[in-house]
């Protein structure tokens, strides 16, 4: 392989091949990736254009709603193809980036599934993406190990968790690979390489190539994925439905199309997941032009609020009607070494997971192995001897309306909340552009979704000239003043050495740009990616 393409349909790689690349970017793997890019990039580009058009319609007054043209799919009696036996019990899933030590610890945790993440908890610099593929290949083969500087060795225990790979969203490019002069979709890069290197070993041990699909906004995007999966199955002579996917419902448009998404992916889908933090971010972003739909402090927007509880219940009802799993959302808490503080953390996790389990969710997400026992105990109590709650149909529920899904929750906009948003967003952006996408901040394991909520909340308050609870109007000038003040707080909290050696000035500049721009920037990871190696 050369770095430059020699024909119009070859892929060009901007990085030279080292030892790591040679393991993953083999001639056969690149040939398969090239086929996918050639076949599916044009339609992916049309889907991204459709997102822009849909947002323009919403901005102009057309609120999201259930689609009248697809009512026949919602009304018809059909089910998904089925769920493999090793995915029938997903009561606790742990998520984390594809870094070697984290992969081992997650697979060894007291959980049923590990979602290995190339998306929101990974800052996708080239080396991390390639190393991530190597780490997952070694995990699938059972050969993965890691030793730290102190000589401690990490390796897999018997019967590790089931592995699911989350690929990047449709909007994210892989800038180190181009096709016809354009960057290729990161989603196809992640999918092609994980599938190609692992499908045989996964099937041989009774599992399969399983994926999580993020940031979907329409059933047409789900149909695109179904075509990608079917192409891969046909290419390698695999039965239809070998590839399985769980799709995150984490955008406001998608919540109105859950039946249609399940139907479009019915050969491959096994469930939907409540991606709650990105859903809140999407709510703000999608309804950004509506002054009557502004959310309060991030800390006040919890899953017991009516619009989020409606989303959870509708997802359960829709999934179980179609024989699909309804997965609960993320508990981002980190256990504390302080016993009293840790008890508070575990009680919050218990309450959160109890709400999900009692609503009828089949399982839930955690971000730290230290929460596994608590989450597991909650679901064990509810499930008893059952593997899941597919029989919980919620047929007694009144129909959930578009108005319920779109109604904002009450709560204050406080100066303390705004300042906390600034500190969290700046610290997260600094970590992300430094190559770390999964960051402990103030006792929570944060990924991109939290920073997205933080910066879009402030943008929305500025845009609609909202007032804080202490009477201060939220303006660009107030934000810039607070940003300067909170940078000093961050410096004092972290210490001069960490602060001066970090990229906090770059992070503050990016935060300032995306929070004060007249047009809301779609994803902070897009301009952030330009600052990443």
Model-derived regions, located:
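Expand to "…catalyze enediolate/carbanion chemistry for C-C bond making/breaking, isomerization
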Residues: 2-533
């Amino acid at each position: 392989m050369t770095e430059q393409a020699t024909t119009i349909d070859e892929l060009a790689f901007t990085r030279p091949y080292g030892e790591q690349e040679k393991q993953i970017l083999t001639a056969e793997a690149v040939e398969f990736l090239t086929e996918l890019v050639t076949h599916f990039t044009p339609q992916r580009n049309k889907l991204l254009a459709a997102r822009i058009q849909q947002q323009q319609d919403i901005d102009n007054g057309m609120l999201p709603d259930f689609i009248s043209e697809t009512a026949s799919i919602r009304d018809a009696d059909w089910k998904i193809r089925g769920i493999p036996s090793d995915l029938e019990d997903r009561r606790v899933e742990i998520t984390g980036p594809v870094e070697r030590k984290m992969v081992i610890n997650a697979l060894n945790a007291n959980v049923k599934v590990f979602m290995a993440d190339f998306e929101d908890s990974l800052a996708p610099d080239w080396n991390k993406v390639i190393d991530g593929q190597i780490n997952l290949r070694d995990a699938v083969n059972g050969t993965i190990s890691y030793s730290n500087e102190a000589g401690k060795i990490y390796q897999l225990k018997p019967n590790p968790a089931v592995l699911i790979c989350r690929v990047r969203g449709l909007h994210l490019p892989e800038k180190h690979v181009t096709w016809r002069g354009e960057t290729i979709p990161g989603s196809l890069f992640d999918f092609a390489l994980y599938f190609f290197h692992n499908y045989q070993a996964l099937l041989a041990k009774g599992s399969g190539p399983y994926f999580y699909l993020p940031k979907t906004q329409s059933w047409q995007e789900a149909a695109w994925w179904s075509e990608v999966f079917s192409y891969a199955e046909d290419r390698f002579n695999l039965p239809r439905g070998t590839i399985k996917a769980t799709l995150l419902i984490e955008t406001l448009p998608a919540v109105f199309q859950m039946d249609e998404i399940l139907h479009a992916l019915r050969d491959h889908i096994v469930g939907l997941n409540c991606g709650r933090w990105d859903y809140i971010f999407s709510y703000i972003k999608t309804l950004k032009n509506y002054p009557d739909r502004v959310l309060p402090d991030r800390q006040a927007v919890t899953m017991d609020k009516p619009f989020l509880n409606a989303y959870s219940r509708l997802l359960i009802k829709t999934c179980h009607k179609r024989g699909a799993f309804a997965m609960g959302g993320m508990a981002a808490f980190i256990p504390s070494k302080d016993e009293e503080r840790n008890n508070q953390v575990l009680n919050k996790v218990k309450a959160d997971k109890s709400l999900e389990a009692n609503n009828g969710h089949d399982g839930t997400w955690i971000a730290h192995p230290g929460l596994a026992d608590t989450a597991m105990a909650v679901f064990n109590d509810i499930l008893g001897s059952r593997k899941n709650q597919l029989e919980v149909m919620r047929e007694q529920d009144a129909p959930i309306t578009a108005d319920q899904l779109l109604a904002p929750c009450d709560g204050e906009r406080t100066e303390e909340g705004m300042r906390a948003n600034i500190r969290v967003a700046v610290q997260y952006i600094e970590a992300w552009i430094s190559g770390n996408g999964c960051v402990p901040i103030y006792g929570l394991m944060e990924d991109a979704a939290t920073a997205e909520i933080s910066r879009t909340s402030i943008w929305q308050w500025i845009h609609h000239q909202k007032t804080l609870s202490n009477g201060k109007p939220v303006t660009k000038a107030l934000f810039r003043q607070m940003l300067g003040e909170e940078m000093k707080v961050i410096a004092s909290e972290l210490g001069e050495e960490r602060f001066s050696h970090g990229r906090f000035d770059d992070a503050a500049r990016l935060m300032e740009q995306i929070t004060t721009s007249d047009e809301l920037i779609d994803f902070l990871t897009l301009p952030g990616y330009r600052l990443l190696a």
